[in-house]
UniProtKB/Swiss-Prot annotation:
Record localization: Cytoplasm
Species for this entry: Clostridium novyi (strain NT)
Keyword tags: Cytoplasm, GTP-binding, Hydrolase, Metal-binding, Nucleotide-binding, Ribosome biogenesis, RNA-binding, rRNA-binding, Zinc
Record protein name field: Small ribosomal subunit biogenesis GTPase RsgA
PROSITE patterns noted in UniProt: ENGC_GTPASE, G_CP
Free-text cofactor note: Binds 1 zinc ion per subunit.
Gene name per UniProt: rsgA
Cofactor section: Zn(2+)
Lineage of the organism: Bacteria, Bacillati, Bacillota, Clostridia, Eubacteriales
Amino acid sequence: MEGIILKGIGGFYYVKTEERVYECKARGKFRNKKLTPMVGDRVIITPNDNNYGAIEEICTRDNYLIRPQVANISQAFIVFALKNPDVNLDLLNKFLIQCELKNIKSIVCFNKIDLYGDYENHEAVKMVSDAGYDYIFLKAKEETNLDELKSKLKGNINVFCGPSGVGKSTILNKLVGKEVMETGIISERLKRGKHTTRHSELVEVNNGFVVDTPGFSTLDLKFDSKEELKDYFREFYEYKDQCKFNGCLHHKEPKCGVKDAVNNEEINKDRYEFYVKTLEEIIQGGRNKW
């Protein structure tokens, strides 16, 4: 029987199948393979009586996060406030690249729109739009456009990420309920209080799942080579065939289709300048971690 792990704690994993949620233990073979089940894992279980079972197989993961430990994230909502705090464009780009690196669809949430007058013309909105990413305007405390956000959850395992103070917790509270955020769905069954250590879990919302703790707590990005970086800037794709050199880094090479597109305002200048700065950091540092 196939299911998805909603929560794991103390060696017990709570697996949702089409029928119900089973409390499962993992077979010893996983310990021998040094493989630990994670929230979000698709698994094969053998159910026993009284809603208990055993995890027999962990299906191949599409991706996984270290903090929080969650597998198979399919969509990330990158939350930034337009004011208090102001948008850090470099940090926003780092979140976008992190998602590209892990093959996670990105949707940018611009929160606190009431604090910024002409919010639709904010430079961050223009940059995200020019790069071809979806975005939503929010006033989370008053639930403005929250229904639009909810409609995008369906069929996905969703994580919310972004810097401190932008309203991630407010959004999560509105989506999954403050009580769930504080104690967790299954915590009540385990008689665990709200002041014990938090473990991430999946909460079902609008036929999708939401990770109940913010994701991407670290942004250490590792690349196999400096040539890899350009692959995570989606707006470069349609211009790379116009470059003279096959291995063009879109940096100092002559006759570069990407640089021409920047000069013609077909590629956002802020995005390109961030790319160049990051590429130079990788090259000058003699490393592929940034």
